[in-house]
Amino acid sequence: MALKAEGAALDCFEVTLKCEEGEDEEEAMVVAVIPRPEPMLRVTQQEKTPPPRPSPLEAGSDGCEEPKQQVSWEQEFLVGSSPGGSGRALCMVCGAEIRAPSADTARSHILEQHPHTLDLSPSEKSNILEAWSEGVALLQDVRAEQPSPPNSDSGQDAHPDPDANPDAARMPAEIVVLLDSEDNPSLPKRSRPRGLRPLELPAVPATEPGNKKPRGQRWKEPPGEEPVRKKRGRPMTKNLDPDPEPPSPDSPTETFAAPAEVRHFTDGSFPAGFVLQLFSHTQLRGPDSKDSPKDREVAEGGLPRAESPSPAPPPGLRGTLDLQVIRVRMEEPPAVSLLQDWSRHPQGTKRVGAGDTSDWPTVLSESSTTVAGKPEKGNGV
């Protein structure tokens, strides 16, 4: 303080001497302002020196942590218990396990791994502690929602999830597109419900791409047309087709005529091995008086029976691919596959497979193609 007083006195003497020499007051003021930053710099340096001193910070931190004597060293060195319930002491900075947790072992760990964390301010340490506590709380909330005990988290987490997923997924229908080769059609065959038997895919007559109808009119056919029915069953390849008749879908025809529903969103272009599967997780939505004729129809004399056009499908599928919901009287979700080996022979050449009987129900869907321009007359059920 004495030095600062002397410096201020000397500055004043210099100003008064220059004023006696007859200089203007403005020049004297300028001369007086020039040496003033020196004592201000000295003051700022003296003000900056107290923060690096460890004594006031340690005293303040000790004073704040005195009420929490039980976990004071854990908060000071950022050590927390494992959120998995094992009781291990973990470092909140690096996550390493601290053997024989104590203040000395925690300090030695910090000095070896990350000594810079000893200089963290109390606010930074509080932020780390808060984030750690939030993470532990989130883990506890997740475990509280799961019925399994915390000791066997990894073992029993997979069991309640499959039980809950089917309940949540029963309402909507799913459309899955598989871009696999035709050498792997066994997955739909294995997932096929027990009551279904393999069917050959229907023969769809060739139609021009320009005959597509608007989306709203696709399901409302004029009275002079009969939609072609598509039999559902597992996808077929040349190796799995039991039907030896020549006009079957395994004929070496390179041309591809997709149904109108499929052409609606692909324009007839399919990659190699394209498979479209429609899964319906719902049970029958109602008594299904409109669907029971389709489910009760049987194939006789090698020709399947025709039926009247089906009513409009649910609006959900109409907005996606214009595919009708296929309902099966079974508890397991059915699967429908559409392969690229449709042929161009007319509908009348469709026959039941070699190993099929004529008394099991077939589940059919509708398309907007016609058969020789004349509708078939459906037989009563």
From Swiss-Prot:
Keyword Transcription: yes
Pfam families: zf-C2H2_12
Annotated region described as Disordered, given as residue ranges: 42-73, 144-264, 283-320, 339-381
Induction: In response to DNA damage; expression is regulated by KLF4.
Compartments (UniProt record): Nucleus; Chromosome
Modification sites for Phosphoserine: 121, 148, 248, 251, 308, 310
Assigned keywords, A-Z: Chromosome, DNA damage, Isopeptide bond, Nucleus, Phosphoprotein, Repressor, Transcription, Transcription regulation, Ubl conjugation
GO biological process: DNA damage response; negative regulation of DNA-templated transcription; regulation of protein ADP-ribosylation
Function: Chromatin protein that stabilizes SPIN1 and enhances its association with histone H3 trimethylated at both 'Lys-4' and 'Lys-9' (H3K4me3K9me3). Positively regulates poly-ADP-ribosylation in response to DNA damage; acts by facilitating PARP1 ADP-ribosyltransferase activity.
Quaternary organization: Interacts with SPIN1, SPIN2A, SPIN2B, SPIN3 and SPIN4. Interacts with TCF7L2 in a SPIN1-dependent manner. Interacts with PARP1; promoting PARP1 ADP-ribosyltransferase activity.
UniProt name for this protein: Spindlin interactor and repressor of chromatin-binding protein
